[in-house]
Amino acid sequence: MVFHRLSRLGSRIVKELPRERHLSMCGKRILQRSYGQYLQSSPMLQRQTRSFKEALFSNNHKFCTSFSTTSEKGGEKTEKINVTFVDKDGEEIHIKVPVGMNILEAAHENDIELEGACEGSLACSTCHVIVMDTKYYNKLEEPTDEENDMLDLAFGLTATSRLGCQVIAKPELDGVRLAIPSATRNFAVDGFVPKPH
């Protein structure tokens, strides 16, 4: 019940936010004044609502959020890094990747043959890439246990192997070179290459 009311509150806040480029809202008064009507309940639910209000508006808890609606289309450019993919034939493909995007998405947007059968849900190893320079590999966050479990299934595993869906572009990775292994374990035997999702 409390979750339902909180989700209604959240969706109402989002709907009523002004169409500005950036907005920050902090403090309990905003919620009490503008959105208190959504926290009111019928007499049957009064006790639960009171507990919810106390938890939400107590002095120990504060509500604070901010968001930005800026985009590249709005005139502001997104920071990009240079990434080089080296395919199985040794051909180099240079692309620019927006900071914050994962390597699998970047490959798909640039028609680079990196499968990603599970669409980045850590359920396969088909987006396996090899970071060609340990200097860049050391700048990456440590792989999670889930990623390591999937990497154990990857074809041609190396000490600098990662899943493309888990490598997020950040400024310190500018210039990284990634090798795409010659095969993955999910490709069909007849050579059929599935289209990116």
Curated annotation (Swiss-Prot):
The family database entries (CDD domains) matched by this protein are listed as:
fer2
Keywords (A to Z) from UniProt? 2Fe-2S, Electron transport, Iron, Iron-sulfur, Metal-binding, Mitochondrion, Transit peptide, Transport
A GO term for molecular function? 2 iron, 2 sulfur cluster binding
The record's comment on cofactor binding reads: Binds 1 [2Fe-2S] cluster.
> Can the keyword Electron transport be found in this entry's annotation?
yes
* Residue ranges of domain 2Fe-2S ferredoxin-type in the record: 81-184
Keyword Lipoprotein assigned to the entry: answer is: no
GO biological process entries? P450-containing electron transport chain
Q: What residues span the transit peptide?
A: 1-74
Residues that bind [2Fe-2S] cluster, according to the entry? Answer: 118, 124, 127, 165
Q: Which PROSITE patterns match?
A: 2FE2S_FER_2, ADX
Cofactor(s) demanded = [2Fe-2S] cluster
Please give the family membership noted in the entry.
Answer: Belongs to the adrenodoxin/putidaredoxin family.
Q: What is this protein called?
A: Adrenodoxin-like protein 2, mitochondrial
What organism, scientifically named, is this protein from?
Arabidopsis thaliana (Mouse-ear cress)
